[in-house]
Structures are given as structure tokens and as C-alpha cells.
Amino acid sequence: MVITRFAPSPTGFLHIGNVRAALMNFLLAKKSKGEFILRIDDTDPERSKKEYVDAIKKDLEWLGLEWDRVEHQSARLDLYDSASDKLRSKGVLYECFESPSELDLKRKKQLNMGKPPVYDRAALSLSNEEKLNLKNERGNGHWRFKLEQNRIEWTDGILKDLSIDAASVSDPVLIRADGQYLYTLASVVDDIDMGITHVVRGSDHVTNTATQIQMIKGLGGEVPNFAHHSLLTGPGGEALSKRLGTLALKDLRDAGIEPPALCSLMARLGSSQ
């Protein structure tokens, strides 16, 4: 059975680009009589607001994109605990203690030398004593996933054959120093646990997909079919943003735009029709 998901973060109102992703996942699931899951990415307690959760549901209902069930990532922290413990036991999740300013300085030095700004894995060479001293001085560190530095390849549902050299990508941070789980880990764990078969999202996630494929395999999950669509931009060519409210769906609704017209445009946009 085809199982898809739409996973917005409740940090602002949905914009037209979000609608396009939601519509694609909804149609893909319903075409195959599958399941469409609304997954609220609310692992950030400071930025996530209930008013935005309610607004997301209202927008999807207005469009007629009815979900089969709702999941909240904030209620699934135990699963993320178990997954991170598993990755630690396999030696692919390691603690780092650099501050944001230190990491920024490293990136600038690499760029000045004509090198890609990739994390140098300095934390992997720390002795146990050095780790203990840093923890005493700075507190808990953040945790990174150790990528296998080979090419990650997959056949994308839209972009076809893709290949990313993992050596050109920094080991992704999965857990912040304050213990908060970041999107990359939560998304992978949920996709595995919910049996997601297809993921349709923006092309800005292509590099994320490469790292997530390695993480899914590291956790023993089955890699879903990925498809990355082109991104929409605002009137001035700027990227759409929930926080900035660019082309917010609520504004289009208030302007009298009808749901069928909007869905029809989003479904055909970028196609030969």
C-alpha cells in the first residue's frame, strides 16, 4: 500500500509552495487507495505554536485534502531516544563541542583556502579525557551522524538518477546540545515507523535525502521512493517562507480564490499541461 505524508512545522501559516507538496502527496496516496498522513513537525517547543497547527488543519480542510490520521512528533520522543541509542551503539553518532562561532570560523577558513565548508570531524579524534574536560567546561555537546564517505545514489521520481558524494557533505547534526531532536532524525525515524513508501518534497531537500538514506539504512529501515519537485518563489524571486508569510494560503482564501482553481493550478504547474 502506498503511504505518504505531509510534515509541516507549525511555525507559521502554510504558503502556496507547501500546498503544492501536500497536494502531490495526497493525490499519490489517493490514486493508489493508500494512506495520507498529516505529520506535525513540532519538535521545537519555542517556535511551534498551536495556533499554527489549527491553521494548517483549516487550510488543508478548505482545500479538501483530508488526511487519514494525524501524528505529532512531540509525542514520539521515546522513539527518537531509542533510535539515537541504536546509532550510538553502532558508533555512528558522536558528540561534538564546537560553539557556533568556532564552526563559523572553520567554515570561513575552508572557503578562504578554496575548500568546501565541510565539518572536519575534529571531535572524532578527542580522547575520553578531552571529552570529559570539554563537557565540564561547556556542558553537553551536540551530536552528529557519521556519514560513510562514498557516493549515495538513488533514482528520483522526478529528477531521475541522482548521486551525491557524501564526502562533500558535513556530518548532519541530529541532536542539539539542549537535547532537542532535529528534523533529520525525527523525519527518518517516523518514515520508518509509519511505513512511508513515497516522499514528495522540494528540491531543496536533495542533500537531506542523501544523508537520510544512509541513516535509514543504519537504522535497518526500508528506503522510500523519493521525488523532488522544483521550488516556487515569491513575486521578487525570493524563497517562500511560512515565517515571512509569503503567498500565505489564508491570504489567498481571503482574496476569494476558490480551492478547485488553486488545486488545479498546483497539480498542473511544471507539467506539459
Model regions: which residues?
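An acidic- and aromatic-residue-enriched active-site/binding cleft used to recognize and process polar
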Residues: 9, 41-43, 202-204, 231, ...
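N-terminal Rossmann-like or analogous alpha/beta NTP/dinucleotide-binding catalytic cores
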Residues: 1-113, 207-221
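Short, conserved loop/turn and helix-capping segments at secondary-structure boundaries
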Residues: 19, 50, 202-209, 243-246, ...
